[in-house]
């Protein structure tokens, strides 16, 4: 496996299976994440941090360069993470020309919930048992220093919170004041509740059920 491929794959807790594909170009060994990337699918299955943000931004930019008119799909199962990493991914999602479908499976919590809501309107989805959690941003670790330093940190937390609220308000249609009140504490939403809230547009049916009723 070359280094370029390894950079776009989240860390797995077990060895991913590889498989062989035959085509007119010959035989190629692949793995699930490479195959998803070929299908223009990005999988966010880890915490949102600088490493995962860099990987996702790189994939978004490459997929746009390959075909700016084809949709990119981002599957999300993430506990959230850092605010600056979130905004780096968010800005890149808004920057690229391709529409971005977002799909939550498992959970989209904290920063990941903002990314879920930031998909192209009408193309934001969740599976039936997914959950979404929104809350105000915070700084990790113990904050120490002079009073003036603490004031700077407090101002930064307030700036981050206001930016998150206005971002969610933009994508959900909710008033920023409502967002602030709802995110004072953890607000946990089912898939249907996330739809009513404006974070997603559609709760997906299982493909098996859709095929049976067709």
Swiss-Prot record:
Quaternary context: Fourteen ClpP subunits assemble into 2 heptameric rings which stack back to back to give a disk-like structure with a central cavity, resembling the structure of eukaryotic proteasomes. Forms a complex with ClpP1 and ClpX.
Compartment list: Cytoplasm
Function field: Cleaves peptides in various proteins in a process that requires ATP hydrolysis. Has a chymotrypsin-like activity. Plays a major role in the degradation of misfolded proteins. Degrades anti-sigma-D factor RsdA when present in a complex with ClpP1 and ClpX. Degrades anti-sigma-E factor RseA in the presence of ClpC1. Does not seem to act on anti-sigma-L factor RslA.
CDD domains given in the database record: S14_ClpP_2
One Pfam family named in its UniProt record: CLP_protease
Molecular-function GO term, any one: ATP-dependent peptidase activity
EC number(s) given by UniProt: 3.4.21.92
Protein name: ATP-dependent Clp protease proteolytic subunit 2
PROSITE patterns: CLP_PROTEASE_HIS (PS00382), CLP_PROTEASE_SER (PS00381)
InterPro entries: ClpP, ClpP/crotonase-like_dom_sf, ClpP/TepA, ClpP_His_AS, ClpP_Ser_AS
Catalytic activity: Hydrolysis of proteins to small peptides in the presence of ATP and magnesium. alpha-casein is the usual test substrate. In the absence of ATP, only oligopeptides shorter than five residues are hydrolyzed (such as succinyl-Leu-Tyr-|-NHMec, and Leu-Tyr-Leu-|-Tyr-Trp, in which cleavage of the -Tyr-|-Leu- and -Tyr-|-Trp bonds also occurs)
Catalytic residues of the enzyme: 110, 135
GN (gene name): clpP2
Top EC class of this enzyme: hydrolase
Lineage, top ranks: Bacteria, Bacillati, Actinomycetota, Actinomycetes, Mycobacteriales
SUPFAM superfamilies for the chain: ClpP/crotonase
Family note: Belongs to the peptidase S14 family.
Biological processes per GO annotation: protein quality control for misfolded or incompletely synthesized proteins
Chief place of localization: cytoplasm
HAMAP family recorded: ClpP (MF_00444)
Record keywords: Cytoplasm, Hydrolase, Protease, Serine protease
GO cellular component, one term: plasma membrane
UniProt entry tagged with the keyword Iron: no
């Amino acid at each position: 496996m070359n280094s370029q491929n390894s950079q776009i794959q989240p860390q797995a807790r077990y060895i991913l299976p590889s498989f062989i594909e035959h085509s007119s170009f010959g035989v190629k060994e692949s793995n699930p994440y490479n195959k998803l990337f070929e299908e223009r699918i990005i999988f966010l299955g880890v915490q949102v941090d600088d490493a995962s943000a860099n990987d996702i931004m790189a994939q978004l930019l490459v997929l746009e360069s390959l075909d700016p008119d084809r949709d990119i799909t981002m599957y999300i199962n993430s506990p959230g993470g850092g605010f600056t990493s979130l905004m780096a991914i968010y800005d890149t999602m808004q920057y690229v020309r391709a529409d971005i479908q977002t799909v939550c499976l498992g959970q989209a919590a904290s920063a990941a919930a903002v990314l879920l809501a930031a998909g192209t309107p009408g193309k934001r989805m969740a599976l039936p048992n997914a959950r979404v959690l929104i809350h105000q941003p915070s700084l990790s670790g113990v904050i120490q220093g002079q009073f003036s330093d603490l004031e700077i940190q407090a101002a930064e937390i307030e700036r981050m919170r206001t930016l998150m609220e206005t971002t969610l308000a933009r994508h959900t249609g909710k008033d920023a004041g409502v967002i602030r009140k709802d995110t004072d504490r953890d607000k946990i939403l089912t898939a249907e509740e996330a739809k009513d809230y404006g974070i997603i547009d559609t709760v997906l049916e299982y493909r098996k059920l859709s095929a049976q009723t067709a």
